[in-house]
Amino acid sequence: NMAVSDINALRSDPQLTVDAVQRGTMYYVAMSMKEAHFANPKVREAVRYLIDYQGINKALMPGYGVLHQRPIKAGMPSTLPDPGYRLDVARAKKLLAEAGYPNGFDTTLRVLSDQPFLNIAIAVQSTLMQAGINAKIINGTGNQIYGAMRERKFDLLVGRGGSGMEPHPHSSLRALVYNPDNSDKARLTNFQGWRTGFYDPQLNTMIDQALLERDPQKQVADYQAIQTRYDQLVPALIPLSQMVDSVVVRNEVREYQPHPSATTFLRDVYKVREGEKG
């Protein structure tokens, strides 16, 4: 939870090394489709164009994340190029008017009190307001914020999630998109898709089938088709940045290898005294 200025200051210390480790976890803006406004795909699409992705990543995310707008982590063979969404207030206003909200509406935006979450929420609040969506920020602890999401009792939320122990498209899709049972009684709280009320049986089937596909080229094509359909459905969860872990290591530490799934083994790590060669 260090500030960007703190990370940059540590980079200038000759006794330290700062490693940037790209994770598969996504920072996102989530909407609850249990809430009437966001059940409307035109409203969700309006929100898509009321996020300053480029500005947020340039100003707020150095040391925390890099611009990424797909549910599958960057750099994998199956990952499609970013769709290139940008802040477009005029387009968002038109969509809101078509949805029946020409003057916008009031809502709430939940967010952790930690950085960079809070600064992201403030930035999103500002651009939502330009189209008449007045989002009151509710900040708190993980239990308060993600707890409300697990209970499906929220409007908008800035959060982070996805990926898994292994770098595979299914890990990301299972965490962020998959929702096999959208009923309240299912209580599938591990699935962000269930938390947001986003449900598409065809997409679920595509995800199941892609995992079992044995031909590597066909599997890549399957995962790309999933991303295309997900985008076309105007989902309730909008990825905006892929997480970067900034790991600070003193120069006397040897054999420390940061891991993208936070599973670094410490058994081979050791420290040398000043003047010794390691």
Question: Which positions does each model-derived feature cover?
Answer:
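Extracytoplasmic
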Residues: 13, 24-26, 104, 235
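Append "and occasionally in soluble cytosolic enzymes with long acidic Gly/Pro-rich linkers
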Residues: 39-126, 130-131, 197-206, 214-216, ...
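Short beta-strand-to-loop elements that line the ligand-binding cleft
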Residues: 1, 20, 109-111, 134-141
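Ligand-site clamp/hinge motif
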Residues: 1-10, 125-126, 134-136
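Short, solvent-exposed loop/beta-turn-alpha elements that line the ligand-binding surface or hinge
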Residues: 9-21, 30-40, 74-91, 101, ...
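Periplasmic binding protein-like
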Residues: 127-185, 230, 236
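A ligand-binding cleft/hinge motif common to bilobed small-molecule-binding domains
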Residues: 3-13, 163-169
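Bilobed periplasmic-binding protein-like "clamshell/Venus-flytrap" ligand-binding domains
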Residues: 58, 98-116, 156-166, 211-251
